[in-house]
Amino acid sequence: MNEFPHIRTPAVAGLFYEADAGGLERHVAALMWAVRPMAQPATRAFIVPHAGYVYSGITAATAYACLAPIRDSIRRVLLFGPAHRVYLEGMAIPAADIFATPLGDVPIDRAGAARIAQLPDVIVSGEAHRQEHSLEVQLPFLQTVLGEFSLVPVVVGRCAAGSVAAAMDALWDEPGTLLIVSTDLSHFHSYEEAKRIDSATCDQLLARSTGLDGEQACGAYALNGLMHSARRRSLQVELLDLCNSGDTAGDRGRVVGYGSFLLH
């Protein structure tokens, strides 16, 4: 690491989650306490949502609680999520050496990130990561459950499923590595319409479809890459929780869908 490391500071602390370390610790602990962990020692990957914690925190916690039985075996997290703040063709790894949160610093696995950067469709872009919330909101959960770990964060723009799968596969099989894909589901439909759309999307994920689009999930490109790799590996997709903002903290006129899944 550089003598003066490049640190990505939090972009959405105080917006999507508490900026105060003590308040954030208490909120994450409460979310984790509220869900029942499902022991899955063969877990290879998770799909988790990325809205503000009052909206999707409980759905995310349902996945992160499953890490408890295997936490000691995980030393590195590959984290893929969609680009919301910049237009991006392909994928981007950060220029930063550290991602900071109110709970502390998460070191970037620069060697692992450099290997992904050698692939076609991958660039190094600090700007793609600077304001991106889809990856950042996962970090306090990971810090709470895992303690110390290194991170390979990848922002995904418009990209073929095979290219995304290749980026995942570059490091996924190495010991101590967990893969997480961050995505929300449908956006801004009525409560009942969102339930219909998200249920159909869930069925496609359970069938490992690589044909998802942005109307179904903002992380469709990352999900299609994950499903591409999951098919090749004969992994199964299991639903942990499915809801929308009308079930948690929002009105039911215009809702956003959330789901958590594990792959084993």
What are these regions (language model features)?
Residues 2-250, 262:
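Active-site histidine-anchored catalytic micro-motif
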